Amino acid sequence: MQIHVIKQGQSLWGISQLYSVPYPRLVDINALEQPGQLAMGQTLLVPTQNRYTVQQGDSFYSIASKTGVSILELRQANPQITGNVLYPGQVLRIPQKPKPTTLVNAFAEPYPKTVDYARTAAKALSWLSIFSYHVDAAGNLRPLEDETLLQVAKSNGVKPLLTITNIKEGADFDTELATTILTSEQVQNTLINNVLTTMNQKGYSGVNVDFEFLGIENKERYNQFLRKLVQKLRPQGYIVTTAVAPKTSADQKGVLYEGHDYQAHSKIVDYVIIMTYEWGWSGGPPLPVSPLPQVEEVLRYALTVIPKNKLIMGINLYGYDWTLPYVEGGPFAKALSIPQATRLAYTKQAEIQYDQEDEAPFYTYYDQNRKEHIVWFEDLRSYAAKFNLIKELGIAGMAFWNLAFPYPPLWILIQDRFQVKK
């Protein structure tokens, strides 16, 4: 598969002719609802069978990044090119090598559209983490209508994971609720029994524990709870994972970070999912949601205390649209799916740029009130860069938040670059 970046004046018909790929297949692979409306800088996935057609502005470095091979491998496969100059239209051979095996998890909430998106993604998934069973102060689980998502997972060979959270009813992740749970043996025992009963009754394959904003006072209490949970579930063959905040040191300050003990989790649970996104978030200044240098910094620290075969990178399926100038405490940025972001770029006649350092696409536009906006999001290039990092570090896999934001070409790209563990 080749990643093509739309240039000025290009049409899907012209791209189909350039690559000798049927027009309907390009529409299908990229799930294009309006194939005549392509934004400048938008990325498309093109089936090219181990060859790459050079685009304007390409270099050996950019082609290696897009295709997931090294510059050396690319040069060795194309000895006819002796210098560094490449010309648009040149066809390079892309060497084939065994695909690395990876775990792919996606979080999904049980809404009708999300169920449809889960069906689309299923072939590229190892796990489906159904979000979420809220835990109350007595250790009870708030009921969740998860039957349809469970059926989608099981019918596609995907292991469903039950996600439990300390989300307070009608609110968000709650420190006080977590403290109530983690300071009571009785509440914890009730919770563990409820988790086990629900998994047995519904056919879950494991649990993901997503307790957030714990504070330092709950760090060791949380570790102890996880030990008790694993002691109860592991003998029955259940997978146990945790979702943790992105840290670059063990003593990183802040209520979001201090309760998550990377090293302890790595010794207790089967896998640790690091939520490596939200540098750019809806209430903060405009930034890439998951800039690759910062993601890499977190993962490289994590690898000093977590075995690589237990470490999973979190990846966002969305971007944000900020109104400029950013004012602290002002209106929150609007979340967008990748198709929404590219459609908006087309509508506003904005050219999508690409930040090579952060490995993230962005663009600016003016709304009807002449207010400037900036949109940071993801595309096939930024995902390919993240996949290259996963391969380089040799970590266990990736976890996507969340399937409410559809992007069908992504699941095809994953299967092109990896052997998905089922």
Description of each model-found segment:
Residues M1-Y19, Q42-G68, Q90-L92:
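Primarily a LysM-type cell-wall glycan-binding module
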Residues Q96-T190, N194:
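Glycan-recognition patch characteristic of GH18 chitinases/ENGases
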Residues A108-K123, E185-N200, G254-Q263, E378-L389:
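Short, acidic/polar
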Residues L128, V209, V272, M313, ...:
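Conserved, mostly hydrophobic/aromatic
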Residues S129-S132, I192-R221, Y271-P285:
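Active-site groove signature of glycoside hydrolases
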Residues A137-R142, E220-A345:
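Substrate-binding surface in catalytic domains of secreted glycosidases
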Residues T163-A178, L317-K386, F418-K422:
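Glycan-binding loop/region signatures in secreted carbohydrate-active enzymes
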Residues K386-K422:
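Acidic/aromatic/glycine-rich contiguous surface patches that form carbohydrate-binding/processing clefts
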